[in-house]
Amino acid sequence: MLSTTEQIAFILLVAVCGVLAFQGFRRIYIIVSQGKPSYRTDNFTLKLIKALIDVGLQKTVFKSRPIVSIFHAFIFFGFSFYLLVNINDLLEAYIEGWTTIGSSNAAALGFNLFSDLFSILVLVGIIYFLIRRFVGKPKVFEFNSNVKLQDKVAQGGIRKDSLLVGIFIILHVGSRWLGTAFHLAEREAAEWSMPTASLIAPLFFGWGGLEAGIHVTWWLAMGLIVIFLPYFPYSKHIHIFLAPLNLAFASPKANGELMEPSDSLNPGASNLDDLPWKNIFDSYVCIMCTRCHEVCPAHESGTPLSPSALEINKRYFINQNSSDLAGGKLKLDLLHEAISSDAVWSCTTCMACVEVCPVG
């Protein structure tokens, strides 16, 4: 249990970071709302349920890159379970005597076992992705040299975001796992329901810093989540929450179906707010995995088109100018900031990018 001072400090931290995060999400709503009307809410409840099931089973992720998708599933299922873990850790911090460690209750034993195993799976998954991005450096992450990119993207912005989130996950999950080992060491006992934490717990038997270690690891695990909240609306990892919504907003029409002829004297879109709101929302949901340009025949043949770069450029420009865009003081010129005219005319409208996209 946290001290009274720590409890108050945590509540204040949640309040401050919560307000900052709310402002970020509010800007997203305002900017997306500036788009043209697009009726995507018919049968929305049923479509959202289907989207949640598809996401829960990782069906959209496993459409390609099966090995990568397995490691993604480690993180997804682990983090999904960690919602319960974080709730439990909050209860431990604020309710005297609350703990699942040492309990003989079947639910507590099952919770401890899954917490322990999922901690390892998440750590294995995130280490795999960090090695893949920073050591393996697969060619699929590269853009053709003639593809238009926002300056921050060209300077490695995606890699920096991936590194920051990777470090956050390792510290969050690793600290929680280590804190469990400290709790076991405090009791000088191993438990079968926490096999991996029990392996390292004996290393800390009799250590005088266990109480401090338990508090430090709690703050690293839980405090980092709260501190990360204001950054979340600007990170590509916001897709965790937005992907199911985007899948539910997907058009019921078949991919590749011809659009109705337009009577507009200015068809198409020159600025961000000329796009339907769904196309603005897409830029927030994009995970920047580049699966789309991996299957794009135009990109693979060396043209300046990258479906991934289009969404990434939109997102980076929005992130850097969100206040002005939300306030109506600035417009995003798509041909200047997001895509070149040559890239537009390189598109074959084959819809391969849409078919492979794991987030709709």
Predicted feature locations:
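Membrane-embedded alpha-helical bundles of multi-pass integral membrane proteins
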Residues: 1-270, 275-277
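Short, well-ordered loop/turn elements at secondary-structure boundaries
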Residues: 70-75, 159-161, 234, 282, ...
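Generic structural hydrophobic/aromatic packing signal, biased to beta-strands
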Residues: 25, 52, 127, 165-166, ...
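Ferredoxin-type iron-sulfur electron-transfer modules in oxidoreductases and energy-metabolism complexes
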Residues: 259-284, 291-294, 299-360
